[in-house]
Amino acid sequence: GKKVIFHGKEWKSLEFNLVKIETDKGITGWGEAFGYTSWKAVKIAIEEMVAPLLIGKDISNIPEVLLTLQKSLHLFGRYGITMFAISGVEIALWDALGKEKNKPIHELLGKKNKDLFKAYSSLFRYGDPKIVEQKCKQSLDDGYQAIKLHEIENNCIEAGRKGTGNLPLMLDTNCPWTYEETMAKKDFLKNMKLTWLEEPIYPPEDYETLAKLNKELGIPIACGENACTEFEFKSMIKQKAATYIQPSVIKVGGIYEMYKIIQHAEKNNISVMPHTAYFGPGFLATLQLASLMKKETYIERFYLDIDQEFYPNFKKAMNGKYKLPSGPGLGIDLDYKRLSKYEI
């Protein structure tokens, strides 16, 4: 099929920043920071900005550590590279703390409400109707009961609906349109019977316009994968920008920041559908947080085969669902030896 192009290059690799911390008690914690083509910048931010603030420090109170990091580094920006770096390290701290206390992270945060989660297959943007339909059918054969497209052309979206049948279909367009362009597609999009329309406009933080679409389009709006910190999500929720918010734990500031976002969303009767287009500690961190949610949620699973799985038992959803692992920390420890040959 067509080559998948990302930021001007053929997309052949998927880079993530794997974060390892070691405590003076000999405990190792693993985290994950957003990478892709920004991985080098995030790596430098972790090494030069975040790590010096933590080495030799007491990390038993992670919420306090998170606040210190955010306050100390705010002059470098409250979202983007800085927050990606903080997120990865903060996840590793929780993993280490859970292992030290021999408890899964969700037990350190609150009361578990569920341990089985519906999953949806999140497809690439293929730009070819035949491939889209084929990938949808393949996802269903693999047990997924819902699918998310990243297409923007009508014929590809129609192919996705055809391949998915009557099961839930989501559409993430990655911010290509204006308000007017989105409204011009209203009848077509409504006919596709979408569960949600994700990030239809640019810029993604134009919450006022998203709120108009959420009210006028007749399709629930989802957004938030590019937002950071609880304060940005509070603004999003206050303006009624979305029916579904989508924080990404490896972007927003880590586990505790996302926990606060979930708490605020549920107080305002907003559903959280986490952004989880990754395979490492960030995926497990999301499951830990999802177990605390009172409202129903979906877990996103990027639909592609990678050369080496972080956690082989989580390669695919079983009968369209993922089960919360029961071990301490993130639930499963990472076997780095299997991954080390992919280090860059």
Q: What is each stretch, according to the model?
A:
Residues 22-100:
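Metal- or metallocofactor-binding catalytic centers and their adjacent structured scaffolds
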Residues 149, 154-281, 317:
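Catalytic core of soluble alpha/beta enzymes
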Residues 26, 50, 89, 102, ...:
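Conserved, mostly hydrophobic/aromatic
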Residues 1-30, 34, 304, 308:
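Structured beta-strand/loop patches that form or line metal/cofactor-binding pockets in enzymes
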Residues 11, 277-344:
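Flexible C-terminal active-site loop/helix
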Residues 76, 101-125, 156, 160, ...:
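N-terminal small/glycine-rich loop or linker at the start of catalytic domains
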Residues 116-131, 173-178, 222:
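Active-site mouth loops of central-metabolism enzymes
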Residues 39-44, 234-238, 257-260, 281-292, ...:
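Histidine/acidic-residue-rich catalytic or RNA/ligand-binding cores of hydrolases
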